[in-house]
A protein has these predicted regions:
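An N-terminal domain-cap segment
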Residues: 1-16, 32
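Short glycine/serine/proline-enriched coil/turn segments at secondary-structure junctions
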Residues: 1-2, 47-49, 107
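Well-ordered beta-strand positions in beta-sheet-rich domains
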Residues: 5-7, 52-54, 135
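A generic structural motif
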Residues: 11, 42-44, 107
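Short, structured beta-strand-loop surface elements
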Residues: 29-101
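C-terminal edge-of-domain segments
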Residues: 86-148
Length: 148
């Protein structure tokens, strides 16, 4: 298959996975994950910070966990279509995706925009790599992030 990106929002932190997401059962993303659970997540914030992570996703129908993580704004994504399809934690359409991270790369830009511009021009002139931030890598494909 092909790699696909989908916009999704992290849910609050909870035991059982490094990251949690909520979605509707029976969608293409659920089918894709059941076929191949390997995932890649990317985050970019304010032009400064960037995170890239890869891991294994697991689809969860655990109603206790759904109740624990439930937020009322989920109702917007699960419109009422008759009992029990009402966007509440007992709505059978709601499933969770738990992701266990195995590798991650973090970049934090520490330089201001003028310094970044200076560093880029300096790099063009000198051939040196611009110094605009720091990178941290966590990479152990055999150990979930929770165990490190």
């Amino acid at each position: 298959g092909h790699l696909r990106s989908r916009p999704m929002a992290n849910q609050k932190a909870s035991d059982g996975a490094d990251l949690w997401f909520v979605t509707m059962d029976g969608t293409a993303k659920i089918s894709d994950l059941r076929h191949d659970p390997h995932v890649h997540l990317s985050y970019f914030q304010n032009g400064y910070d960037w995170v890239s992570a890869s891991g294994i996703a697991e689809v969860s129908l655990n109603r206790e966990k759904i109740h624990e993580l439930y937020a009322t704004d989920w109702k917007a994504w699960f419109p009422k279509s008759g009992d029990p399809r009402d966007g509440t934690p007992d709505d059978p359409r709601i499933v969770l995706i738990g992701v266990t991270i195995h590798a991650a790369e973090f970049f934090e830009r520490t330089a201001s925009r003028p310094v970044v511009l200076y560093e880029v021009v300096k790099g063009w002139l000198t051939g040196e790599t611009p110094e605009i931030g720091s990178t941290l890598s966590l990479d152990d494909p055999h150990r979930p992030l929770q165990e490190r």
